[in-house]
């Protein structure tokens, strides 16, 4: 125990709270570059995982499996497998509502926007769409486990990026956005995973 305690003391000594600046400043140009980088990273990540999605369920992908990245790969997937980017088009739907209706847009406006969109959805997203359009169950009940067998799926986790990108250095704001929108389609672990991702983005600035 003494060794463990001394080890923890050493670790916390090297990474104390004094290492975290009380204030971070950056130019608008740097901020914009970081936000663009976040969107680019999400798009690249969707594409990179495309060839292996659902092929290695329950096991790790072996190091011997090549992950190819030919030229124009993103363009190819966007044109031939657009469903792969549900992470992106769900995010953009929510951002569009913020852009048109403001930061205090009512939660029903987000719910109806994606529920009536023509793009394909799966699992938690699809269950929420069904609840909203066909059962008249609006958020937050649309994502509650009593109404959705997919409430704890990863749908919100893979779509929460926008909440962090819109809240640079403001994890509390990212959590508030997540509380409103995440419960449209998720509950419990399905929601907590999204809040975690949104906060990582917010703190990355």
Segments (PLM) and residue ranges:
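Sec-dependent N-terminal signal peptides
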Residues: 1-5
